[in-house]
């Protein structure tokens, strides 16, 4: 019997992220060149992330698999929908203790996931296909980039007990760090590609 279950999440636009599944993730970028920042280090592009694999979905019944309707599978739980969100134009203005489970989000904005935050009124949309919108100086980021901090809660279905749980991101733009219940799970820089993390040991009974 298949022993995996999947939390599906599709994010189409983050510059970078920090996800804390209670659920929170926020975008990170730019600081001084003198610091050896993870997001400016080309040798560090991921950690604690599942290896890439062919796309698949989990189903209990053959008919559901043939029809390929993920909403019919009890082994998948979508996190798409309304999330709490804070936008900051630079890392200096971003939330520093975003991963704390007791951090109140009552005054946060909301955002629809999946989506680009620019088309929901945060930041400025950039449309450019022939050259950079900044002077490239790899691996350093010499200009401020926006930070998006996302959060939402969910409850793990009871029939998932004893199974491994993967958190699946369909797409993230840029650098992302993922947190669950206040604990850092992993990191990815593979922009616009799926990213999965095994969050089994970070979950708890009831609300996460």
Regions from the language model: what does each represent?
Residues 108-111, 116, 123-128:
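Non-catalytic accessory segments of hydrolases
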Residues 1-36:
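Bacterial Sec-dependent N-terminal signal peptides
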Residues 4-7, 122-124, 130:
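Short helical patches
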Residues 38, 44-49, 69-70, 84-88, ...:
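Accessory beta-strand-rich segments of carbohydrate-active enzymes
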Residues 80, 105, 150-151:
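Hydrophobic residues on conserved beta-strands that form the core of alpha/beta folds
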Residues 130-138:
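Surface-exposed acidic, glycine/proline-enriched linker/cap segments
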Residues 94-107, 111-113:
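Short Gly/aromatic-enriched secondary-structure transition segments
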Residues 35-78, 82-84, 91:
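N-terminal pre-domain segments of enzymes
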């Amino acid at each position: 019997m298949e022993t995996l279950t999947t939390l599906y999440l599709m994010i189409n636009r983050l510059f970078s992220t920090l996800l804390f599944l209670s659920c929170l993730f926020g975008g990170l970028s730019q600081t001084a060149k003198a610091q050896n920042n993870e997001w400016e280090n080309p040798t560090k592009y991921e950690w604690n992330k599942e290896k890439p694999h062919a796309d698949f979905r989990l189903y209990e019944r053959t008919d559901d698999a043939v029809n390929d309707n993920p909403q019919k599978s009890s082994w998948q739980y979508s996190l798409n929908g309304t999330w709490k969100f804070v936008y900051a134009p630079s890392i200096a203005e971003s939330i520093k203790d975003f991963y704390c489970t007791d951090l109140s989000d009552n005054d946060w904005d909301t955002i629809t996931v999946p989506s680009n935050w620019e088309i929901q009124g945060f930041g400025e949309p950039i449309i450019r296909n022939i050259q950079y919108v900044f002077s490239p100086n790899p691996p350093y980021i010499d200009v401020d980039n926006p930070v998006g901090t996302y959060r939402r809660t969910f409850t793990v279905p009871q029939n998932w007990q004893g199974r491994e749980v993967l958190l699946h991101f369909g797409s993230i733009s840029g650098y992302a760090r993922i947190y669950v219940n206040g604990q850092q799970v992993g990191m990815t820089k593979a922009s616009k590609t799926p990213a999965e993390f095994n969050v089994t040991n970070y979950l708890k009974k009831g609300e996460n």
